[in-house]
Each structure stands twice: as structure tokens, then as C-alpha cells.
């Protein structure tokens, strides 16, 4: 059972419901926002930030989804690991590809750029102090400075809010 009460949609702030398209999402897709809805103004800011990360994204959806799923594994966020986002699926994310994330550096169906981004995400999630000049030099082989900043902000979002979601223990809707 979740450790924070999930608000029913009827109890959400009207603007937050609209911003998040909550009425069209499944409970799994609504995710932690069901708890965040207790603080609607803060949640609107979070939604705006998350929306900006997605709407202004220059990185491929496939790469972002691969990094998200690998970070979710390290966060041990069961709901984060269970969900599959449509934009990632439309950009080539399959369950076979997801299985490659068990040992991503050995996977032959991941590009070198994807492996570099996944490695960065893994280190950010597990040992951020190990992210050194060599890691950034490797990222620069595949990504511009602005793409590296975008990746960094996206990974920070995944790590922080994935851990928060894991701590809420939202497992009721999991397959």
C-alpha cells in the first residue's frame, strides 16, 4: 500500500488535472502525481518543468527512455520500471531492447551514444562522485554541450523523483 494517500481525481486542483491530462491517464500513468496533488501549486511548477524537459527535448526519445529505465532499475522504483511511455515505444523501445539494459555495455543493439548516456545515468544514480572528466569527454564524442546539459537535467529529474516515487511504495497498480 502507498505510504502517502493517493488523491482521487475529483480532489485534484482543476488546473493541475488539465496540465497533466490526468483524466486520460491510467492510474499507473498518473503515478506519483496522485500524491503530489496534495500540493497543487508546487505540483504545477513540477509539471511545467517536466513538460519543458519533454517539449524542448533535442535528445532522441529512445535514448531518454533507455536512460530512464536504467535509472529506474538503480532507484528500484517498481512503478518507474513498469511503465512504458508511448514516445519511447514509437521511437523503437521494445521489450527485447529493455532486456538489453540488464548489461547495457555488452548489448549489441545499443549505439555507442546510448551506452555513453546510460553510463552517465548509472553513475549519477549510483556514484555521482565517480563522474569525472573522462565521463564528460566520452559524452562529448556523441553530444553537444547543450545536449549534455539536457541529459544531465533529465537524469537528475529521473534520479530524484524516481527515488521519491520508490519511497512512496506505489505498487497497487503494478502488473
Language model features: what each stretch is:
Residues 1-175:
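Hydrophobic alpha-helical segments
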